[in-house]
Amino acid sequence: MMGDNEGRRTPLLNLGVQVSMRVLIIGAAMASMWVMITNREVASVYGIAFEAKYSYSSAFRYLVYAQIAVCAATLFTLVWACLAVRRRGLVFALFFFDLLTTLTAISAFSAAFAEGYVGKYGNKQAGWLPICGYVHVYCSRVTISLAMSFASFVLLFILTVLTASSARHY
């Protein structure tokens, strides 16, 4: 009797962890996306006004689109995880989708981080000056967005490892 209950509790506990992690991932990705989309600042340098917006940077646009994809894929796999409890053959496909989502998240974070680094510190060899001295709020919000993006990546990475472990047992 005890063995039957123990065998049933493990998949339900696994499902609870899967659902919780996926909800946290969606929240972090949406927060990152929202902060980046609403980020805008106008500054004046030597009497010339310029605007800093996420849409002016291809790396920041990629981050936003990738976060949309992460949210959509994680929402899809949230439903998939619930189905995988009943049909164990779906667990490997779940792992595969989690892996692709994780790779998308880290590639977008890396591209946006590189752009943010150049914006903050410049690149003397290329002649690019840092802009964060002029648009403090914009750079601070980019940092917050990148932190949330990295959090979603870390959660996705942990989830992918957990899903791989679950797939091994089936």
Curated annotation (Swiss-Prot):
Its main location: membrane. One of its GO terms (cellular component) is plasma membrane. Pfam families: CASP_dom (PF04535). It is a multi-pass membrane protein. Coiled coil: none annotated. Residues 38-62, 110-141 are extracellular. Keywords: Cell membrane, Membrane, Transmembrane, Transmembrane helix. InterPro entries: CASP/CASPL (IPR006459), CASP_dom (IPR006702), CASPL (IPR044173). It is found in: Cell membrane. The keyword Transmembrane helix applies. The chain crosses the membrane at residues 17-37, 63-83, 89-109, 142-162. Residues 1-16, 84-88, 163-170 are cytoplasmic. Belongs to the Casparian strip membrane proteins (CASP) family. NCBIfam families: A_tha_TIGR01569 (TIGR01569). PANTHER family: CASP-LIKE PROTEIN 1U1 (PTHR36488:SF8). Homodimer and heterodimers. This is CASP-like protein 1F1. It comes from Arabidopsis lyrata subsp. lyrata.
